[in-house]
Amino acid sequence: MKRLLFITICTLSCILCGPLAHKAAAQTYASDLHHTTHEERAERRAERLAEYAKQIDSIVLSHNFEFNPQSVQLQPAGTLNLLSNANYTVFVWRGSLDICLPYYTGIVPPYRYVLLNTGTPNISDYVTTQTDYGWTVSFKATLYATDEYTFLFEIYSHGGATLTITNTWYNPVQYMGTISQIY
């Protein structure tokens, strides 16, 4: 009788505690699996970002790239306007500049919205500097025969770029977009 009672108690305790023990083991396994896959994803992401940073370095050091803006803003604190025209670009190629961008002229409101659509065969004071976040590229170009514009690219190693165009007569205009390689 004692044996029967002992076997019954053991059986009932196994029935009641078995799923709990199995569930705890399954949670531990799932947690370990999650940490493993999370670490693997983090490693793959770090590898992709390092590869992309190398690609950006190559593009900047070649001095041949294309800037595709996605937004424009008059500085300081102008309204941010999104750009949807695929023809708005800046090409820097072998010491020359080809530009097609909207631009704000005027010192006080109302500002005029004009199009910088020109090219110049020579740019001057070309300076490339590596920073903590990526690269800074600056140069000067004379557009429309007499007006000197300063171009400042802030190129981020994890994607994206900012272009600020300044002129002696007008407020700076800032563009945000992407940098790509010219083939």
Give, region by region, the residue ranges found by the protein language model:
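N-terminal secretory signal peptides
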Residues: 32-108
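Bacterial Sec-dependent N-terminal signal peptides
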Residues: 1-33
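Helix-rich interaction surfaces within compact, conserved domain-sized segments
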Residues: 32-33, 124-183
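Short, low-complexity, polar/charged sequence segments that are solvent-exposed and flexible
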Residues: 84-90, 118-119, 156-161, 182-183
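A short, polar/proline- and glycine-enriched secondary-structure boundary/capping micro-motif
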Residues: 78-79, 108-113, 172-178
